[in-house]
Amino acid sequence: MELMITLSLAAVILGIGVPAFRDFGRDGRLTGAANEMLVTLITARNEAVRRQARTSFCSSSTPDSSLAVCDASATQGYIAFVDTNGNCQREASEELVQSMVSHTEIYQRDNMDCIGYLPNGFRVVIDGQPANAHAVFCDKRGIAKVKDGTSHSYARGVEIVSTGRAAVTRLYDDINLWAGGGTPVTCP
């Protein structure tokens, strides 16, 4: 009898705990991916100010290589480099400041093919582009609101404003707008 009660209690605890633990792991992966991007962006900006030179941040299909170059469609990682000629393409002679291998795919990038930083730390805004750039990280849960009474999304978003400041957010309204403003989203 005692064994039956113990097994029943264990089944209830596992039934409640395992799904919550799975979401905890997923949340950690998304937060980690967004923070990886944020660290590389902050490094690019800080190096521009420290060196008084233009730097750039971009996606790369070979971020773990000393010959890493920019690739707008890449999801393997990011690089930050001293962009001496200001063309947002890393040349062999341009110093690699930081590289980061990403372990999570980005669902959506908006205006993030290349983020350039000026020596004053401000972002280079190319004519015709919006002042802010965004990236959305999500998993199979999509960008839906977390059902906990907050305005948080399951997804994570990174925003870079024209002043060069980058930040991570979980706010559903922002992420929904960046991911297509109500258009159905298919996440990896």
Name what the model sees in each region.
Residues 3-20:
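Alpha-helical hydrophobic helix detector
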Residues 1, 7, 44-46:
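Residue-level micro-sites within transmembrane alpha helices that shape
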Residues 16-42, 46, 50, 54, ...:
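N-terminal helix-rich module
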